[in-house]
Amino acid sequence: MEVMDHHHHTSSTRPNPTTRRMNFFLPNAIHMDSHLLYYRPQPGYGAPPPQGGYGYPQPPPPQQPYGYSQPPPQQYGGYNGVPPNAPQYGRPGMPSVNSNAYINGNQNAPPPPPQGMHSFGQGAPQNYAFQYSNCTGRRKALLIGINYFGQRGQLRGCINDVKNMSSYLHENFGYQRDDMVILTDDQQNPMSQPTKQNILRAMHWLVKDARPNDSLFFHYSGHGGQTKDLDGDEEDGYDEVIYPVDFRQVGHIVDDEMHRIMVQPLQPGVRLTAIFDSCHSGTALDLPYVYSTQGVLKEPNLAKEAGQGLLGVISSYSQGDMSGVASNLMGFFKKATTGDDAYNKTLATKTSPADVVMWSGSKDDQTSADATIAAQATGAMSWAFITAMKKNPQQSYVQLLNSIRDELATKYTQKPQLSCSHPLSMVPPLLL
């Protein structure tokens, strides 16, 4: 069994983390949370994990949600294609974090993001580019927290993570409650339960009708794991997955599907910020550029992808040339069937003309932690992100990455990881 080594502090000022997720190896190359999965929907995936769980008695779900006003998701209108009434972003008299302090004379604040289209860099075709979002448009958020009440591997902090994150977005970045879909397993409305069907439907709602300079926010706190990679796009041979509350009946959600739903449809200049507080979440959105506080961990070979014709698909899409998309795809799949080694796994590029940024609290070979902080169960990444942002909301990507690392280092052995759909400029501020 492979278990992450968390430091256990005895000081009253520090939490005593418990391992939120543990990894063990099963036949057929499945890695998952040992406390969670005592059986799978499909037979034959190995023996059950140890009995007992975490040792924290968990009361049944309360009869009412947390107490903040939350209409059920089906009332948002987004699922049926009818957008809610346009909200007033920000409260009167309250400056938004996005009213950039650099423009207002604070030279210590990072400058605003560069405008226009930007090249992916060396090896990319000339017309292949992406665009940053200035986050001045519409805001929508999808927040998912699953404690798995009554199931083996029950967690304590995931619903608290969502409550804290939604309040932070609302109070500091002008996200309106009516533009948030919150799926947690303490809610009585079946449409607000984090089932696989509801999660997938909400992912489609999140990105529907997104326009340049819109800001979309996705937050997942719950169990994560790995499964055998079937399409050859993962270096370690495994796809990352998340587990809906009903995964035992209907299965998990794979990173390839999350990328297809939430990343591929986005136009240039649309921001999607994602936070995953789960194990094996480092590449949960299948983004091609991965950074740590030590530097670049992973980046695509654009020259190779361009030579294979992969980048033509997305450049045609970003220019609205759907016929170009079709012809590029046909040419790609034709080459893929010729036996050419370059196409033997039918790989598609994971870059995007949009502005997609993902924060995760662990590398794919680490676990995440479920700890008690200020007498409240919470996930490490969710807590560290909010704590670091509250201390200094005007940070660049690299500053925030280091700030989150410093927060985590006080209580955890985890390291933060930042993944992007495009090469990361360390200069632009993090806008939400």
From Swiss-Prot:
Pfam families documented for this protein: Peptidase_C14 (PF00656)
Residues the record marks as active site: 223, 279
Biased composition (Basic residues): 1-11
Region annotation Disordered: where it falls in the sequence: 1-21, 41-87
Domain of life, source organism: Eukaryota
Composition bias, Pro residues: 46-74
Coiled-coil segments: none
A GO term from the CC aspect: cytoplasm
EC number(s) stated in the UniProt entry for this protein: 3.4.22.-
Protease keyword on record: yes
GO molecular function, one term: cysteine-type endopeptidase activity
InterPro entries noted in UniProt: Caspase-like_dom_sf (IPR029030), Metacaspase (IPR050452), Pept_C14_caspase (IPR011600)
Keyword annotations from UniProtKB, A to Z: Apoptosis, Hydrolase, Protease, Thiol protease, Zymogen
Catalytic EC class: hydrolase
UniProt feature, compositional bias: Low complexity: 12-21
A single GO BP: proteolysis
PANTHER family per UniProt: METACASPASE-1, METACASPASE-4
Record-stated family: Belongs to the peptidase C14B family.
Role this protein plays: Involved in cell death (apoptosis).
Name this protein carries in UniProt: Metacaspase-1
